[in-house]
């Protein structure tokens, strides 16, 4: 799916997005964000959507939230409440300098973007050495057959998500990132919470 198609899809999704995802995503979001190191000062949220992560962010941090969809970001404004800077931009071409963030959140975004490997590469680029990357999304595991999920992939892509992304395939392209925690998060482990650290 192209970013133009994503824009159209999320214009439709935006009014119902919260109702669709809050139920299964609230607890994993909170659990992931609770792992943000106390020393973190600059946090980037890639794929911020309607701002469902914002209530869980720590105090006294500089928070930047990015999304490609204007329709989604408009709904994030009340949750930002002056504590989060909102940026409309492409996750595959981040408008930030290298190593500028202590922590990056990627919740329900890698299975949405057209090229998840590019989005992960960009997240790694703007994460400082020693920084933390927190991911929550649906992934297949290496070698997992999951015929129904693979069969649904073309249909789900038309609905602005994918069901056939293997995270380990993405990670092999990023040797500077170490996976330090991998927890099942929802739907029998299809959704996972991942914590990664960038090597110094």
Q: What is the predicted role of each segment?
A:
Residues 1-13:
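N-terminal, positively charged/glycine-rich alpha-helical extensions of SAM-dependent methyltransferases
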Residues 4, 20-23, 134-194:
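C-terminal alpha-helical "lid/dimerization" subdomain adjacent to the S-adenosyl-L-methionine
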Residues 23-41:
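Conserved alpha-helix/loop element of class I SAM-dependent methyltransferases that forms part
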Residues 42, 130-132:
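Short glycine-centered segments of the SAM/dcSAM-binding site in methyltransferase folds
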Residues 42-93:
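Class I SAM-dependent methyltransferase SAM/SAH-binding core
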Residues 92-104:
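A short acidic, Gly/Pro-enriched loop at the edge of an enzyme's catalytic core
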Residues 103-115:
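A short SAM/SAH-binding and catalytic strip from SAM-dependent methyltransferases
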Residues 117-129:
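A short glycine-rich, Lys/Arg-flanked "PGG" loop and its adjoining helix->strand segment in the class I
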């Amino acid at each position: 799916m192209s970013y133009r198609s994503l824009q159209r899809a999320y214009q439709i999704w935006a009014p119902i997005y919260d109702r669709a995802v809050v139920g299964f995503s609230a607890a994993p979001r909170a659990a992931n964000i609770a792992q943000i190191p106390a020393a973190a000062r600059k946090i980037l949220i890639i794929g911020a959507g309607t701002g469902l992560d914002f209530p869980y962010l720590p105090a006294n941090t500089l928070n930047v939230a990015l999304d490609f969809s204007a329709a989604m970001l408009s709904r994030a404004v009340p949750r930002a409440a002056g504590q989060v800077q909102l940026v409309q931009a492409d996750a595959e071409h981040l408008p930030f300098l290298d190593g500028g963030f202590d922590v990056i959140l990627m919740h329900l975004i890698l299975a949405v973007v057209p090229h998840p490997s590019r989005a992960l590469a960009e997240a790694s680029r703007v994460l400082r050495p020693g920084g933390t990357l927190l991911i929550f999304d649906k992934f297949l595991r290496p070698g997992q057959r999951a015929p129904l999920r693979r069969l649904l992939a073309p249909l789900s892509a038309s609905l602005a998500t994918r069901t056939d992304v293997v995270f380990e395939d993405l990670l092999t392209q990023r040797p500077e990132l170490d996976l330090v925690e991998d927890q099942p998060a929802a739907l029998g482990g299809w959704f996972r919470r991942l914590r990664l650290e960038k090597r110094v």
